[in-house]
Amino acid sequence: MNKENELQNYLSISPDKFGIYLFDTKNLTNLYKEEIILNNDTNYQNHDELKKFLDDNIFKIEKLSGKFIENIFLILEDKKIFNLEIGIKKKNYNISVTKEYLENSLVEAKDLFRESYHNQEIIHMIVNKYFINGKMLLLFEENLKCENFALEVNFKSISNDIIYDLNKILENYQIKISKYLDGSYVKKNFKNDIELSEMS
């Protein structure tokens, strides 16, 4: 891993707080952390407030890291994050279920979602359960003999309009969003910064 990839930048946006972080993935330490609590009168989608927060912190992070921020992971907590569970049931014509068969099934699920929700960008695709011949499994086991295969998948997505607005703001700093993360999902499933950096 080169030095440039050892540093990850995160921007967190929620109804009550903005946060920006610089994380060293090699030494597993947070090098910079700045958060601002938004008062009840502040609309967290107020772009002027977000721009001011970025103005106050981007240069400090760049000075600390010795390089420009080009990419950032965006952690978004918003009621507008769309959640959808879908199930896919398939007849398996092979002797057993392979990893490749699973991957193809997940691609099919993703395609189904995109066909139905054109204005949404998938940020998380979570497999909740697998069913092999009607038996539920929480973890995928390869090469099990199987005639009937089913998946229960949870999609988390945000609208392309929100993506467009956030990209426009960050373009002013020549920063691209590398990945979007659902803040509620992150809080629920990742105990610390190390686990989060491994996910991203």
Predicted regions span which residues?
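Nucleotide/phosphate-binding catalytic cleft detector across ATP-hydrolyzing
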Residues: 1-17, 21, 25-71, 76-200
